[in-house]
């Protein structure tokens, strides 16, 4: 059968918080079958746990943030969550000693490397997929996102940025998910922002960790990073990365096609909530044979980078 996965060993790294600009220590710990994905703040006493759940997402203004009833939060979880989805990790404890996950280079690639460093352990329990059974759509003005039944996990995403540096023919991406495809084609895409917005946020004491090291930065006319883009469609690819992370907030791989136009963290989360709230829209699926799986995860020992 296709089994649940966790890490072989504990791994740790440090980085900078995007909003605070301060050093953050991130620790990833193995967890038993059916634990799920749990984010944990260790700098509060007692530590506070946030199980991966779309209902825990209560702020999507600048990132995806998990917030509990007491107002304790962990921000910027989406890139790490995308790496967990990409590597097929079902059970893990993610510990941070700050209110946010470190931003690293603004992509999911450092987290993929960290997970590969820890190694992947298969557990003696069936991996549970969420299979989409009927179309569900969520709209917000001209923006929309929808799930339709599909025997695999496909992302069909379109953005619309009227900017000289963002080519009009590089604003659409169709991606059929596999671990290998995620690592090679998606994980290295960085977040992006406009210099005017970053300057304004920093004047409000936000985005203090924002820099050319962790984002693609644009002015009105061009990309300001000396090294330019990692690949031509990096902008839409990063939006797909974000969506993979946002949708994995249900803690399970999805079998279905996600289509979106100008969607962001908020819309992705609202769609996920709408799907899970409709008992006729989805069902649990497990697979006795690896060969029969519509979603391809890499073998645990395989190096993908």
UniProtKB/Swiss-Prot annotation:
GO terms for molecular function: metal ion binding; UDP-3-O-acyl-N-acetylglucosamine deacetylase activity. The active site is at residue 265. Its cofactor is Zn(2+). GO terms for biological process: lipid A biosynthetic process. It is an enzyme of class 3 (hydrolase). Belongs to the LpxC family. This is UDP-3-O-acyl-N-acetylglucosamine deacetylase.
């Amino acid at each position: 059968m296709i089994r649940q996965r966790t890490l072989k060993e504990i791994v740790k790294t440090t980085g900078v918080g995007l909003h605070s600009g301060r050093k953050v220590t991130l620790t990833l710990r193995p967890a038993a079958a059916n634990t799920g994905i749990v984010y944990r703040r260790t700098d509060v006493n007692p530590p506070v746990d946030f199980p991966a759940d779309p209902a825990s997402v209560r702020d999507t203004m600048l990132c995806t943030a998990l917030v509990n009833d007491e107002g304790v939060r962990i921000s910027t979880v989406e890139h790490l969550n995308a790496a967990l989805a990409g590597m097929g990790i079902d059970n893990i404890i993610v510990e941070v000693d700050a209110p946010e996950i470190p931003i690293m280079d603004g992509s999911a690639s450092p987290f993929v490397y960290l997970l590969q460093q820890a190694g992947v352990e298969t557990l003696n329990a069936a991996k549970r997929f969420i299979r989409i059974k009927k179309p569900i759509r969520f709209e917000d003005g001209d923006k929309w996102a929808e799930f339709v039944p599909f025997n695999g996990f496909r992302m069909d995403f379109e953005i619309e940025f009227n900017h000289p540096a963002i080519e009009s023919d590089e604003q659409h991406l169709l991606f059929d998910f596999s671990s290998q495809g995620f690592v090679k084609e998606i994980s290295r895409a960085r977040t992006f922002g406009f210099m005017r917005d970053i300057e304004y946020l920093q004047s409000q004491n936000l985005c203090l960790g924002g820099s050319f090291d962790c984002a693609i930065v644009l002015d009105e006319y061009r990309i300001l990073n000396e090294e330019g883009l990692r690949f031509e469609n990096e902008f839409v690819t990063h939006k797909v990365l974000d969506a993979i992370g946002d949708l994995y907030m249900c803690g399970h791989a999805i079998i279905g096609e996600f289509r979106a136009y100008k969607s962001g963290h908020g819309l992705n989360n609202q769609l996920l909530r709408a799907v899970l709230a409709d008992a006729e829209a989805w069902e649990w699926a497990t697979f006795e044979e690896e060969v029969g799986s519509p979603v391809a995860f890499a073998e645990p020992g395989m190096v993908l980078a």
